[in-house]
UniProtKB/Swiss-Prot annotation:
It comes from Listeria monocytogenes serovar 1/2a (strain ATCC BAA-679 / EGD-e). It is found in: Cytoplasm. The keyword Metal-binding applies. This is Rhamnulose-1-phosphate aldolase. SUPFAM superfamilies: AraD/HMP-PK domain-like. It catalyses: L-rhamnulose 1-phosphate = (S)-lactaldehyde + dihydroxyacetone phosphate.
Length: 273
């Protein structure tokens, strides 16, 4: 006999995280999406993995994820509603063996579908798993100050990263590889997924100019914290600029010392010698 899936840690984590993202104003309306890679063992505690509710075609070759299970936010769903109605707003899916569809095992009880950004998420999972087999979460949101920075700050990865590192001491420690930036592209397309996943091979944070940010990590907390840290730095930058601009900041020598103390290495070429 299976357990009640509402008691599953992964459902509770997703509900708590989506509520926090909405509360912070980073996922207005139906903005934002999360995919959470699950182990078959943890899914089987709550669901009959052979019981397929329906099969949903996918316009993307997901064969590299064949057989894998994911908890996914729904297309057009509001994050503010997840905690009260998980079964409507979330779905547990399994990628088909040919990678051309996903099987719905639970959720989307109103006939809903996985997020329209599923290709970008799946491509990002493939990219991250190739460099970090423990990666489980891909998260997209519209973090306010990071989004604002894409209108006012130079959009080169080195310059953008350096500004974030200089705004909060913890930033270099949390994302020493820096942030990736892609061009503005139409959301929900394979094109934006391909651009994002290419950057995901080296970065866990990818900025979508004038749109939002993608983050990846080994857990829900790690991924949320990664975005949260970068967003805090962007907020500080916004306040600093409104107060008249930067008069002093963390120096490159100090950033190097920080990296040495915490055992991380800044991305090559990002610090001045």
């Amino acid at each position: 006999m299976t357990k009640d899936i509402m008691d599953a840690v992964f459902i509770k984590e997703m509900a708590k995280t989506t509520s926090n993202l909405y509360r912070l104003g980073w996922d207005e309306r139906n903005g934002g999406n999360i995919t959470y890679l699950l182990d078959e063992k943890e899914v089987a505690e709550y669901l009959d993995v052979k019981q397929i509710i329906r099969t949903i075609p996918m316009d993307f070759d997901g064969k590299k994820l064949a057989g894998k299970y994911f908890l996914v936010t729904g297309s057009g769903k509001y994050f503010k509603n997840v905690e009260e109605a998980p079964a409507v707003n979330l779905g547990v899916i399994q990628v088909s063996e040919d990678g051309k569809a996903v099987h719905l095992l639970w959720g989307y009880t109103d006939g809903g579908l996985p997020t329209s950004e599923l290709p970008a998420h799946f491509m990002s999972h493939i990219a991250r798993l190739s460099v970090d087999p423990e990666n489980r979460v891909v998260m997209h949101c519209h973090a306010t100050h990071l989004l604002a920075m894409t209108f006012t700050h130079e959009l080169t990865e080195r310059a953008f990263t350096r500004t974030l590192w200089q705004m909060c001491t913890e930033c270099l420690v949390v994302f020493p590889e820096g942030v990736g930036i892609i061009p503005w592209l139409v959301p929900g397309t394979n094109e934006i997924g391909e651009a994002t996943s290419e950057k995901m091979k080296e970065n866990r944070l990818i900025v979508w100019p004038h749109h939002g940010i993608y983050g990846a990590g080994q857990s829900m907390d790690e991924t949320f914290g990664l975005i949260e840290t970068a967003e805090k730095a962007a907020e500080v930058y916004t306040i600093v600029m409104s107060q008249g601009g930067i008069k002093q900041a963390i120096t490159d020598e100090q950033l190097k010392a920080l990296g040495e103390r915490f055992g991380v290495e800044a991305k090559a070429g990002y610090l001045n010698n």
